[in-house]
């Protein structure tokens, strides 16, 4: 191929200075000193580096020239004129043959190279365009600088040309015709499959706890059917409260078995040494010191009394009274017979209308007698017969 020959032609001038340098460093065949040998090697190294950079610049120049020729040919095929800044450059670079070995090697892809993807090709062409524009501005500073805008304009022309070649006839046919009204909507498609189940939602706020206040009672329901009789329960204890409520309105007092001298032991002659046998506390009240019996409820009362007396000092009779509020209500008098014993009893009773807070008592009339307070012979009591008759 032509490429290796060019490489040999370029590398031959580099070999001659290397031989001349080696002869100069030898100093007519004499052995060189260590310092001069190092300087010669350093010089040869820089010279080789400069030559390699020149070769690289030349290769880039040739590649840029071939690329510009291809773009110029594409513009001529599209029928567009070149930019003013690139006309002189393209004419000056037109002397190189695009079919030369170096141009074909640098500008065209090798047959073994695999085609790139569309995105990769666009990136590669953009990087090549930027590199080529920089080289053109470097080698031709007198002409109008190339910019990326011109390269984009060229690429847009290429794309528009290719699109016009593919869709041009169809678009030309449609020119001049008005678009018709849109057609009716098509039938709806079949429903798609159900989507996946979504995540569970956030739990709600717990409710306020209710109150335990009891509501108003409802209306009474209808009575149910009568149930069977139950078993007989055990006998209960007597109800003291019921017994007390049903207790009869009576009081009975009796003596405590003592012997009393009226003159020495009684104050005012009223008997007070009583022992309660029965008494309804809701109707009667006993005053132990004074010996008086107080009535708590208005009504009609039956009052009775008996006293056993012992005669002394030749007294031939005995007498006592039943007083109500210190006023005589009943009186009993008994005389002694000649040749009889000195003991004797006297009994009296009567019915009286009494008001609440009135007091009953037994009062001795004569002071020269003694009283035998035996529980069987001396007693005093009252019975409430009922309400007082209306007057």
From Swiss-Prot:
Sequence ranges of Polar residues compositional bias: 102-113
Assigned GO CC terms: apical part of cell; collagen trimer; cytoskeleton; endoplasmic reticulum membrane; extracellular space; intracellular membrane-bounded organelle; lipid droplet; membrane
Mutation effect (residue 374 to R): In XHED; decreased interaction with EDAR for isoform 1; decreased interaction with EDA2R for isoform 3; changed downstream signaling
Tissue expression profile of the protein: Not abundant; expressed in specific cell types of ectodermal (but not mesodermal) origin of keratinocytes, hair follicles, sweat glands. Also in adult heart, liver, muscle, pancreas, prostate, fetal liver, uterus, small intestine and umbilical cord.
Disulphide-bridged cysteine pairs: 332-346
Result of changing residue 316 to E: In XHED; uncertain significance
Known outcome of mutating residue 153 to C: In XHED; abolishes proteolytic processing
Reported impact of residue 358 to R: In STHAGX1; likely pathogenic; severely decreased function in positive regulation of canonical NF-kappaB signal transduction
Phenotype for residue 158 to N: In XHED; abolishes proteolytic processing
Record SUPFAM superfamilies: TNF-like
Transmembrane domains' residue ranges: 42-62
Variant or mutagenesis effect after changing residue 381 to V: In XHED; likely pathogenic
Keywords, alphabetical: Cell membrane, Cleavage on pair of basic residues, Collagen, Cytokine, Developmental protein, Differentiation, Disease variant, Disulfide bond, Ectodermal dysplasia, Glycoprotein, Membrane, Secreted, Signal-anchor, Transmembrane, Transmembrane helix
Chain intervals for the UniProt region annotation (Disordered): 73-127, 146-245
Main location: membrane
Domain called THD: residue spans: 249-385
Residues flagged as site, Cleavage: 159-160
Impact upon substituting residue 304 to H: In XHED; likely pathogenic
Subunit structure: Homotrimer. The homotrimers may then dimerize and form higher-order oligomers.
Associated disease: Ectodermal dysplasia 1, hypohidrotic, X-linked: A form of ectodermal dysplasia, a heterogeneous group of disorders due to abnormal development of two or more ectodermal structures. Characterized by sparse hair (atrichosis or hypotrichosis), abnormal or missing teeth and the inability to sweat due to the absence of sweat glands. It is the most common form of over 150 clinically distinct ectodermal dysplasias.
Similarity comment text for this entry: Belongs to the tumor necrosis factor family.
Protein name: Ectodysplasin-A
Source organism (scientific name): Homo sapiens (Human)
């Amino acid at each position: 191929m032509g490429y290796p020959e060019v490489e040999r032609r370029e590398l031959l001038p580099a070999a001659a200075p290397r031989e001349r340098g080696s002869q100069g460093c030898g100093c007519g065949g004499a052995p060189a000193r260590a310092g001069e040998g190092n300087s010669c090697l350093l010089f040869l190294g820089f010279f080789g580096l400069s030559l390699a950079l020149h070769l690289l610049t030349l290769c880039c120049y040739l590649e840029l020239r071939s690329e510009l020729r291809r773009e110029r040919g594409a513009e001529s095929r599209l029928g567009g004129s070149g930019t003013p800044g690139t006309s002189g450059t393209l004419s000056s670079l037109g002397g190189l043959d695009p079919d030369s070995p170096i141009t074909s090697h640098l500008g065209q892809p090798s047959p073994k190279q695999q085609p790139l993807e569309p995105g990769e090709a666009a990136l590669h062409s953009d990087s090549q365009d930027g590199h080529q524009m920089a080289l053109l501005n470097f080698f031709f500073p007198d002409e109008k600088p190339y910019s990326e805008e011109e390269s984009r304009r060229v690429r847009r022309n290429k794309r528009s040309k290719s699109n016009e070649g593919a869709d041009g006839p169809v678009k030309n046919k449609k020119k001049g015709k008005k678009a018709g009204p849109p057609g009716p909507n098509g039938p709806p498609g079949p429903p798609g499959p159900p989507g996946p189940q979504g995540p569970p939602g956030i739990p709600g706020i717990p409710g306020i706890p209710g109150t335990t206040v009891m509501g108003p009672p409802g209306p009474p329901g209808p009575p149910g059917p009568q149930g069977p009789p139950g078993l007989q329960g055990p006998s209960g204890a007597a109800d003291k409260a019921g017994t007390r409520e049903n207790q009869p309105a009576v009081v009975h007092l009796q003596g405590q078995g003592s012997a009393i001298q009226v003159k020495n032991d009684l104050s005012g002659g009223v008997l007070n040494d009583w022992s309660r046998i029965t008494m309804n506390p809701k109707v009667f009240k006993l005053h132990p010191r004074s010996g008086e019996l107080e009535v708590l409820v208005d009504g009609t009362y039956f009052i009775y009394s008996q006293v056993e007396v012992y005669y002394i000092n030749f007294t031939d009779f005995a007498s006592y009274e039943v007083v109500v509020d210190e006023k005589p209500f009943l009186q009993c008098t008994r005389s002694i017979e000649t040749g009889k014993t000195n003991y004797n009893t006297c009994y009296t009773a009567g019915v009286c209308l009494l008001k609440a807070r009135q007091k009953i008592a037994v009062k001795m009339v004569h002071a020269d007698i003694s009283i035998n307070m035996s529980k069987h012979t001396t007693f005093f009591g009252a019975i409430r017969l009922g309400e007082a008759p209306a007057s």
